[in-house]
Amino acid sequence: MIDTQLPLTDLHRHLDGNIRPETILDLAQQHNIALPAYELETLRPHVQITKNEPSLVSFLQKLDWGVAVLADLDACRRVAYENVVDVANAGIDYAELRFSPYYMAMKHQLPIEGVVEAIIDGVQSALHTYDVEIRLIGILSRTFGENACQQELNGLLKHQDKITALDLAGDELGFPGHLFQPHFNRARDTGWKITVHAGEAAGAESIWHAIKELGASRIGHGVKAIEDPRLMDYLAEHQIGIESCLTSNIQTSTIASLAQHPLKKFLEHGIIASLNTDDPAVEGIELKHEYTVAAPAAGLTAAQIRQAQINGLTMAFISQAERDALIKKVSLG
């Protein structure tokens, strides 16, 4: 179901949600960090979804063991490097890797700017070996409050030329978007693109706010848009991209079943929506699964799946020249 003549993109992929279980074990051993289990198979239920979680917040707790082993900046470099390797091994041509430097720094009180630098270094190092296109998106983790997000933003701004966009993620219900308006005003002044997690745990009003007040040109998840016909029209008319993550939405119990997922209706409505992974290591999936298993289960036709693949390229935070180069590179094999 993947058109190999077209670039394959993953635009919603959390670097800190894709720390390999093997790496968690290895780093814990290196740094003498206590884990709930010390064998891969017994650790897996603690770091990977084995059954659907009751909420987004409980799903996010699975990520905590991955960042708990980031005891130094070398560990951050390693997971950044491995993220690029995983993108290449998944056959993805272009990925936007997003990360929250505060979340990664928090457990071991690492310098936030140092974490940003380590992520950039790890990615650049991997790109010497692996022929993929990578862009970085900084995340403000709303869960930790406005002050933490300001520290996060400051660290990201120190390397603003290496960061493509800013995102807002975390506890959408507990920390609504209006708290972070000053942060996003600053980000837009910098020239960054804006994508926001919205309409996942909260309703359609969260999406409206992300677009109108935070300046989002793309929305992460956005499933609750289906509840507001006026918003559906607006998304289509203004070409606001929806970064759909099918498996993730089931595992967080945001949507009860793939058959009920609104992605098909988004595409039928002319909304530019794409297929993405979210947190591959935590979910136990890769992008191919979203195309070959999840999308058909969500009722998408082969033509709609191909359209979602095209949409990924359309929505990507790159210039038209970069888009054309990517198309040419893939078509030439």
From Swiss-Prot:
Q: Which residues bind Zn(2+)?
A: H12, H14, H197, D278
Which residue ranges does UniProt annotate as crossing the membrane? none
Q: Where is this site: Important for catalytic activity?
A: H221
Q: Which SUPFAM superfamilies match?
A: Metallo-dependent hydrolases (SSF51556)
Give the GO biological process terms.
Answer: adenosine catabolic process; hypoxanthine salvage; inosine biosynthetic process; nucleotide metabolic process; purine ribonucleoside monophosphate biosynthetic process
Cofactor(s) recorded in Swiss-Prot or TrEMBL? Zn(2+)
A GO CC term attached to the entry? cytosol
Q: What is its EC number?
A: 3.5.4.4
Which residues of this UniProt protein bind substrate? H14, D16, G170, D279
Identify which residues the record assigns to the active site. E200 (proton donor)
Keywords of the record, alphabetical order, are: Hydrolase, Metal-binding, Nucleotide metabolism, Zinc
- According to its UniProt record, which reaction does this protein catalyse? adenosine + H2O + H(+) = inosine + NH4(+); 2'-deoxyadenosine + H2O + H(+) = 2'-deoxyinosine + NH4(+)
Q: State the superkingdom.
A: Bacteria
Which Gene3D superfamilies does the record cross-reference, listed alphabetically? Answer: Metal-dependent hydrolases
GO MF annotation, one: 2'-deoxyadenosine deaminase activity
Q: How is the cofactor bound?
A: Binds 1 zinc ion per subunit.
If you read the UniProt record, what top EC class would you report for this enzyme, in one word?
hydrolase
Regarding protein family, the annotation reads: Belongs to the metallo-dependent hydrolases superfamily. Adenosine and AMP deaminases family. Adenosine deaminase subfamily.
Q: What function is annotated for this protein?
A: Catalyzes the hydrolytic deamination of adenosine and 2-deoxyadenosine.
Q: What is this protein called?
A: Adenosine deaminase
- The species is Proteus mirabilis (strain HI4320)
